[in-house]
Amino acid sequence: MEKNLPKCWQTVKDCLENGIDRLILFGPPGTGKTFAGLHYGNVSAGAHRLVCTDDMTNADVTGTYIPSAGDWNWQYGKAIKAWEGDGVNGGRLVVDEIDKAGGDVFATLLSMLDSPESASWENPETGRVHRPRQGFSAVMTTNIEDMRELPDALIDRFPVRVRIDQPHPDALQRLSPDLRNVASRMCDAGDRRISLRAWITFDDLRASVGKERAAEILFGDRAESLIDAMTIDAI
């Protein structure tokens, strides 16, 4: 293992750098799951991100016509772009918050995340049949904790699931040294959790208004206890 790399991140690294092409990263928000999906492993053929929402449509996944200079041009969706990669090798598809995908979109994603031998999509306008190129991989992220909340069909396609319970060490380096331990602990503190983004904002703000005022602004009635925790860590 690399020095100072938490177990969850070492697992992600081992998977994506050694041929695991279907991976779910789950756990509290703000830990770097999306960043890992976009950058870990071989992404030389490109990485494409979808963020699932209730109003997302299949056009975001497969493509649609868009107006351009008085005409209509076909623009492929993120999944097809990931399938095609660089034209020789498939790229990476990162689907954020997969649990928020609507029914139609979810069904389309499932079909596109089937085995390479079975997955295909026909462009309804041109009749061209697309299939994932060799090397295509997919990473799903979700903030839910219980994988039983995800449909069985998705779980079947993604046998490897890693809970990310700590910020990546590289992300923690953005914080001043005195904040890194407490920020790492609070990332996975259940209902009391504080995101890494909030700590970064606090770090920036305290430089101008002082730590007490910055804590009051960012953390409200928890400010005093968090300042105490920072003080203890500094000892």
What are the functions of these language-model segments?
Residues 1-235:
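C-terminal regulatory/interaction module of P-loop NTP-utilizing enzymes
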